[in-house]
Amino acid sequence: MPSVECNTTAAKEHVSEAERMIQMVKERIRGLLATLPFSHVPKRMKIEFVYFVILWLNAFPVKSGISQTISPRELLMRWHLDYKIHCRVQPGTYCEVHNEPVPMNTMVWRAHEAIVLGPTGALQGSVKLYCINTG
């Protein structure tokens, strides 16, 4: 692997590579928000969509990166994301999740309405959810 070159900048000076990356992340988030059928998106959902976009940007190798075949995420975590596990549900999908804090034999509603925020990035393929009732 090639050596890493560190180039520091002065205060108030822009780094074009970082600025381009920020612009690309914003474009991806805007694209994701445009696919949602909601007129209002809560702030917490927007924050989680940033995590979602960064997760997938780091899941693929970068042409100008350290390795041409290994993704930045795989370099750090030592394992890669699997399509069958981590792409089961699209972000913004409505779902009802089961909740049973204490076993009871009552007719209380045990499902919560939620919106999928994206995968957590864990090996098991867990998914982050936004509860509509509680936020």
Regions found by a protein language model. Name each.
Residues 1-135:
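Nucleic-acid-interacting cores, centered on viral/eukaryotic replication and modification enzymes
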